[in-house]
Amino acid sequence: MIFVTVGTHHQPFARLLDALGDSGLENLVVQHGPGRPPANVARCADYLPFEEMLACFREADAVITHAGVGSILCATREGHTPLVVPRRHDLGEHVDDHQVELTRALEGRGSVVGVWDTARIPELLEAAPPRRPAVEPVEPELCAAVRSSLAQSSDA
C-alpha cells in the first residue's frame, strides 16, 4: 500500500492529486484535504484522525507526502524515506515557499526524496531506498504530550 497525505492545510493540492491520477499507481490510500481525490485510490478521506494516520504510516510500503514537518517525521519514524512533494507559493498551493526550502534541506541530508517533477513519481518510488526498521522517539513523554495537544486542537 502507498500512503499519500497532503496534510491539513486549507488550500487544495491538485498538482499532487492530479499526478497520482495520471500515474498508473495502484493500492493508494490518500488523505486528500480539501482537494478532489484521484480515481485510482483504494481508500480516501479528506482528513484522518491522528491515530489512523499513524496506522497508515506503519502499514504503508511507501509514503508520498507534502512537505509538512509532522508528516515527514511520522514517515521517517516508521522507517520510510518519503517522497516529498513540496507545496509551492507560485502555484497558489501555500502562503510561502517554506516547504520547498525544507524539502531541499532534507533531501540534501538524504532524509527524503524530493519530487520536483510529479510525472516522475512512479520512477522515484521504484528507486527509493528500502524501508528501515521503525525507530522509537528519544523522548516518548514529549512525543505523547505533542500528540495529545494535536489531538485536542483537531477536536476543537
Model-derived segments and spans:
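Conserved sugar-transfer catalytic core signal across GT-A, GT-B, and GT-C glycosyltransferases
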Residues: 16, 71, 102
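C-terminal amphipathic helix plus adjacent low-complexity
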Residues: 123-156
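Conserved catalytic or regulatory cores that recognize and/or transform ribose-phosphate-containing ligands
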Residues: 1, 27-32, 62, 99, ...
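Catalytic binding pocket for nucleotide-activated donors in carbohydrate/polymer assembly enzymes
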Residues: 81-116
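Donor-nucleotide binding loops and adjacent catalytic segments primarily
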Residues: 1-59
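A donor-sugar binding/catalytic signature common to diverse glycosyltransferases
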Residues: 53-92
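Residues at secondary-structure transition points
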Residues: 11, 48-54, 58, 66, ...
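Short acidic-hydrophobic, aromatic-tinged amphipathic segments that line or gate anion-handling sites
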Residues: 44-47, 111-120
